[in-house]
């Protein structure tokens, strides 16, 4: 299984249960060329300089906004034996937040 694609963040133990989906459904997206994006709570970030999405684990750098403040940091993610994703988003010189995610399944209205 590849990391490439969109993952729905289902749990972030460091926050109250409803915080990750405060503004939109929490997610992390890994694309080709080491890019991607994520959103949880009031934080949005652009992923750049990521290692290969073809592996089962990835490390990345990111920059974005949290409550309208500029933030940046690093992150890691790894596919678990059950096919879920476990990772951590770290703020530079600051907090580290663990997350758990499942592959995003899209549904199209009929």
Language model feature labels by segment:
Residues 71-107:
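Short, compact, well-ordered microdomains
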Residues 36-41, 59-66, 87-90:
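Short beta-strand segments that buttress and anchor functional surface loops
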Residues 43-46, 66-67, 92-96:
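Short, surface-exposed beta-strand-loop junctions and turns on beta-sheet-rich folds
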Residues 8, 37, 57-59, 84-86, ...:
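General beta-strand recognition
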Residues 51-83:
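Mid-chain, well-packed structural core segment of small domains
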Residues 1-8, 105-108:
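N-terminal helix-cap/turn-to-beta initiation motif at the start of protein domains
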Residues 1, 29, 54-57, 103:
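Low-complexity, Gly/Pro
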Residues 6-9, 17-55:
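N-terminal glycine/threonine-rich, aromatic-flanked beta-hairpin/loop signature
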